[in-house]
Structure formats: C-alpha cells, structure tokens
C-alpha cells in the first residue's frame, strides 16, 4: 500500500511539473551571434538620437503661462450651454432626509436616493456637484 501511495505521489508531482512548464512562455534563442549583432546594430540606427536640454526658470515660467492660456482656451471651448434643470417634483424629500423606496422623490434634480445596510438606511445625496 505504501508503494502505491509513493507511485501516485510521484505521478502527481510529475503532472504538476508538466502542467506548470507547459504554461510558461517559450524563450527565444538565436542560432548564431552574428544575427544577434546585426539585429542590435539595426535597432540602434533606426531610432533618432535624444538630446537633453536644461530649462532655466524664465523658460519654465513662460511655458507654465502658455499652458495655462491653452487650458483656459480649451475650457472655454468645451463649456456647454447651460441646460435648464428639470422642475422639482411637488411633494419631495430634502437632501440628507430619509427616502426609503415607498417615499417620494428627492427635491434636488441632481440628487438620488442612496441606500445602505440592506436598504435599512436611505437618504437623498448629491454626488455630482457639476450636475
């Protein structure tokens, strides 16, 4: 009985080893060093050289100012026309008041009823201030 357990344990270890090795990525091996050298020299020549230039304080300030101008222009162009908010429902629940499902809707059109603890504690909350 001990021999069969030993045989089964060995078989299990071999299966684990082959399973793990079959999932590993295969390694790429070059056939000769000449192809490796030619590939590395070709790759270096393909890319342009990089030069590093130190910026002084004045150029940093100018670039920061230009960036602020560009961002303000983008914000001005991206602003949408203010859409009118939908009217409030007549009987409604104020923010941070209880709004369990049989209760009425929230007064703020940007608010919604958020429930916690398996819908035992519900309240109207505004999570998107830009609404």
UniProtKB/Swiss-Prot annotation:
InterPro entries according to UniProt: Agouti (IPR007733), Agouti_dom (IPR027300), Agouti_dom_sf (IPR036836)
One BP term from GO: hormone-mediated signaling pathway
CC per GO annotation: extracellular space
The Agouti domain, residue ranges: 92-131
UniProt-annotated location(s): Secreted
Main localization (coarse): secreted
Superkingdom classification of source: Eukaryota
Region (Disordered): 58-92
GO-annotated molecular function: melanocortin receptor binding; neuropeptide hormone activity; type 3 melanocortin receptor binding; type 4 melanocortin receptor binding
Pfam families per the UniProt record, alphabetical: Agouti
Gene3D superfamilies, sorted: Agouti domain
Signal peptide from the UniProt entry: 1-22
Record key words, sorted: Disulfide bond, Glycoprotein, Knottin, Secreted, Signal
Glycosylation sites (chain numbering): 39
Record flagged with keyword Secreted: yes
Positions of disulphide bridges: 92-107, 99-113, 106-124, 110-131, 115-122
Known role: Involved in the regulation of melanogenesis. The binding of ASP to MC1R precludes alpha-MSH initiated signaling and thus blocks production of cAMP, leading to a down-regulation of eumelanogenesis (brown/black pigment) and thus increasing synthesis of pheomelanin (yellow/red pigment).
The record's note on its domains: The presence of a 'disulfide through disulfide knot' structurally defines this protein as a knottin.
Protein name as it appears in the record: Agouti-signaling protein
Organism, scientific name: Sus scrofa (Pig)
Gene: ASIP
């Amino acid at each position: 009985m001990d021999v069969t357990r030993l045989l089964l344990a060995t078989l299990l270890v071999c299966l684990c080893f082959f399973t793990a090795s079959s999932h590993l990525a295969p390694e790429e091996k070059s056939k000769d060093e000449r192809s490796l050298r030619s590939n590395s020299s070709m790759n270096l020549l393909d890319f342009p050289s990089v030069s590093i230039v130190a910026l002084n304080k004045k150029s940093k300030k100018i670039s920061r100012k230009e960036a602020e101008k560009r961002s303000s222009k983008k914000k001005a162009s991206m602003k949408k026309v203010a859409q009118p908010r939908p009217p409030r429902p007549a009987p409604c629940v104020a923010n941070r008041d209880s709004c369990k499902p049989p209760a009425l809707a929230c007064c703020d059109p940007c608010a919604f009823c958020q429930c916690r603890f398996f819908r035992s504690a519900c309240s109207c909350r505004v999570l998107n201030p830009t609404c």
